[in-house]
Each structure stands twice: as structure tokens, then as C-alpha cells.
Amino acid sequence: MKVSFSPAAQAELLDIAAFIAQDNPARALTFVDELESKCGALGGVPGIGTLRPELGEGICMLPHGRYLIFYRAVNQDLRIERIMHGARDIGGDDFEVGESLGG
């Protein structure tokens, strides 16, 4: 499956890197690399995550450290919708209703 990132997920990767870099710039780079690698690997095993229907149609979640990767698979595409800290109060309002995989 082709893996893509929503604009929100792209922005969250930058925010995560900036937050971690405040204390450890080197770790910020490696952690974001790990997140991106895990997201890329989802294309090969999209069913590995937990389905979260309360968040939106087809939304699945996979943890990475203290962060949660939210994604959706449609046809031959897998879109990373959000990457959020697990301590957040996450609900359906955090996901766009009816947003297409195209961008």
C-alpha cells in the first residue's frame, strides 16, 4: 500500500520534533525517523493496528512510545491521519469527516 500523511500529521511530526528538541535535539531526529519508519511499515501490514470506529470510519490506531499513530486504509492507499500524544483527550472531533485520501 502507498502511505501518505495528512497535513495535520505532517504538522504534528514537526511539532513532536520541536518539542523533543528542546531537551535533546539528537533524540528529536531519531524519534521522528522512528515514527516515519513505523508509519511506512504500516503499508505492508495495515491490519496490525486497533480499529477505532468511535473516531471515524475506518480509523485505526497503533502506538509508538507515548504517541499514537492514527491511520485509515482505503483501497490501495494508507493515510496517516494524526500522530498524537497518548495523554491527550482524543475524540472524533480530532478527525475530519469525509476527508478524502487524496489530500
Residues covered by each model-derived region:
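Basic, Lys/Arg-enriched alpha-helical interface segments
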Residues: 2-59, 93, 100-103
